[in-house]
Amino acid sequence: MKIESTLSFIFILLFTSSIYGYNKENSCEKLMQNGNNLEAVDAAKKIKNQYDKHFCLGKAYYRSNMHELAIKAFNDSEEGAELPADQMFSILYKGIAERDSGSINISSKTFTRGLETAKLGNSKYLQMERRFLYQLGQNALSTNEYDESIDFFSKSIVISVNDDERAEGLDRLSLAYYGKKKLDKAIEYALKASNMYLKTGDLNNYADKQLNMATYHLENNAPDRSLRLLEKLEQFAKDNGSQYYEAKALLEQSLVFKSKGDEQNAIARFNIGFDIAKSIGAKDLLPPKK
């Protein structure tokens, strides 16, 4: 287990079927895999296939935080796509780049166009439909349009083809309900997402959802339930060798004890969690020591 940052951009491509034409073994991709993004830009420009050239160029620009150039490259790749699936990936990535450049409304229009394109293939492009629904949900969530995000995420879950996709949708659904302050629903879907993450072996996201649930229980006036979750997470982290989540669970326990008026246990948990976080250099967990 290790801490993971939340990335909006999709880098895992499913170009394993004949419906995709993109060559993921090109030199640009290989350079990006090693973190050489600017070198990948130069390599992409030398690729002869126009779709591969512009698509990988867009990814390399995006990874280099050059969002406007990425958007243009993805637009060019869409125009050069010979297969519908390649076209839809260009639309998908363009929408993500637009969102991350701050153009949420334009991004949502792009995702909606992609969704309509995917629907033209009936069930052939259900995976692409799910991706567009999920990204539309992300956009709605980011602008606090919780009812819309719930609708998009719910639809994405229905057509998910594996537990990883279902976990992802359930996770975001819990956040949308939390945004609406529907705490019982937020807890319900956080639990479902947590169990699904555990089933798939995604221990980082499992731990994060346990932390979310603890917060929801605390805000739902159930501090004892929150504490039990955090104590179980602390033990789970120990068993799986994650001092980061062990420290995080202890620091969260401190907050729960403080809410209950138990200063002695609050300080004790804080000090233990602080010392662990300090020993592993987890700066994001290091508030001023009491």
Feature locations, PLM:
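Short coil/turn linkers that connect adjacent helices within long alpha-helical scaffolds
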Residues: I47, G80-P84, L120-K124, I159-D163, ...
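N-terminal leader/linker segments that initiate helical-solenoid repeat arrays
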Residues: S18-E68, N75, P84-A85, F89
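Residue register of alpha-helical TPR repeats
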Residues: D52, F89, Q127-R131, E168, ...
